[in-house]
Design a protein with these regions (language model features):
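Accessory alpha/beta interaction modules
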Residues: 15-24, 61-63, 68, 76-78
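Active-site beta-strand-loop-beta-strand hairpin of nuclease catalytic cores
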Residues: 49-63
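A short beta-turn/loop motif at secondary-structure boundaries
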Residues: 41-45
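Non-catalytic C-terminal interaction segments of nucleic acid-processing enzymes
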Residues: 2-32, 36-38, 101-180
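Short loop/edge segments at beta-strand edges and connector loops
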Residues: 37-40, 93
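Flexible, charged surface loops at secondary-structure boundaries
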Residues: 28-30, 57-58, 83-85
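Short beta-strand or tight-loop elements
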Residues: 47-49, 105
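Catalytic cores of nucleic-acid endonucleases
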Residues: 68-113
């Protein structure tokens, strides 16, 4: 099943990468993702996510890859390495930079600068257990994640996003929402 979520347009002007990143971050926060990070790189992974968010209640990890132009999209050959880390993945680009037929059905596309829709296929969710010590443990990750990412690396990713990726914030307690 696909979700169609209308976005507001910023019609008629070219958008810079920083502006696209700010729009994507704002969009993710509007969707209710409690922990949102920019330019995030999990330890020892060799990848860097433009915008990543972890939902506190639905146990979803969403990654947005920012593409400022068609050339930027065509030159990118690393985005498929991001898929094992998330339940939802989408490109964020100016309208017309990426064509829907160029993407796999499981990959979303958010276009700014024209009436646009985010198109996302629902991904299977995985279970987690949140311990009182504010430690996240993957209990039953999806097969895709289990095959591609070692458990220690997955736990470190979630800990970093949930606990250490908010500027000026100390480690929150369980009651303050450290659990996902």
């Amino acid at each position: 099943m696909l979700d169609y979520i209308p976005l507001t347009a910023t019609a008629g002007r070219r958008l810079a990468t920083a502006e696209l990143r700010a729009l994507a971050t704002s969009r993710m926060e509007d969707l209710g993702y409690a922990y949102v990070g920019n330019e995030f790189s999990p330890a020892n992974s060799g990848v860097r996510f433009d915008v990543v968010g972890v939902s506190k209640y639905t146990r979803q990890v969403r990654i947005y890859e920012i593409k400022s132009s068609r050339g930027d999209f065509l030159a990118d050959d690393k985005w498929e390495r991001y898929l094992p880390y998330c339940t939802h993945f989408a490109f964020v680009a100016p309208a017309g930079a990426i064509f829907r037929f160029e993407l796999d059905r499981a990959v979303g596309l958010i276009e700014y600068g024209a009436p646009a829709f985010e198109r996302m296929r629902r991904a299977r969710r995985f279970g987690m257990t949140v311990l009182r010590e504010d430690c996240l443990r993957a209990t039953r990750p999806s097969r895709r994640i289990r095959d591609a990412v070692p458990d220690e690396q997955w736990i470190a990713l979630l800990e970093t996003i949930a606990l250490g990726n908010r500027p000026g914030a100390s480690d929150p307690s369980y009651e303050e929402g450290a659990g996902i």
